[in-house]
């Protein structure tokens, strides 16, 4: 795949659009999982529900800055998530958690489903070997914001209670483009 062959996705929010390139060529398992949620409309009507700033993680020795979204609402009639996917580390893909990187949230390796986050600033502690997760496997980066980082930063600065956005920011629609 060339750069132009990679899928493009737009997240529509009331604050504006976030346009992303999905690196299906470098992170095929993670990209396919994310695009399955997109294509099936499962992100439509969900939320950005978490913001992590330097100020709201006082007990964390390793600080990061991200916004997190993609939880499928519990009132959906169909299953909320597909099975968890294999963990594609940044060591495997060559991708890094740089400003605007999109990555899958997880607890343990192989537990990622629908929840994703977008990095604000470079976040090397989220890469393979980084110290944010004790297992040091990092998180599975799979794309990059190409337009709309102003919207991402605006979401990050919205009112929050601890790390929970209050109110959460609506994800109106997530769809492929061009």
Located regions from the model:
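Cyclophilin-like peptidyl-prolyl cis-trans isomerases
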Residues: 1-178
């Amino acid at each position: 795949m060339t750069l132009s062959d990679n899928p493009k996705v737009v997240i529509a929010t009331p604050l504006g659009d976030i346009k992303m390139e999905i690196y299906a060529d470098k992170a095929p398992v993670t990209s396919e999982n994310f695009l399955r949620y997109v294509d099936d409309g499962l992100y439509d009507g969900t939320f950005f529900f978490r913001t992590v700033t330097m100020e709201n993680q006082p007990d964390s020795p390793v600080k990061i800055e991200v916004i997190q979204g993609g939880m499928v609402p519990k009132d959906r009639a169909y299953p909320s998530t597909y099975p968890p996917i294999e963990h594609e580390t940044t060591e495997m893909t060559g991708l890094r958690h740089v400003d605007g990187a999109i990555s899958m949230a997880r607890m343990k390796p192989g537990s990622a489903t629908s929840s994703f986050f977008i990095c604000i600033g470079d976040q090397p502690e989220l890469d393979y070997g980084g110290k944010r997760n004790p297992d040091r496997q990092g998180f599975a980066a799979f794309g990059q914001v190409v337009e709309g980082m102003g919207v991402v930063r605006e979401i990050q600065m919205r009112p929050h209670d601890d790390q929970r956005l209050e109110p959460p920011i609506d994800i109106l629609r997530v769809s492929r483009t061009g």
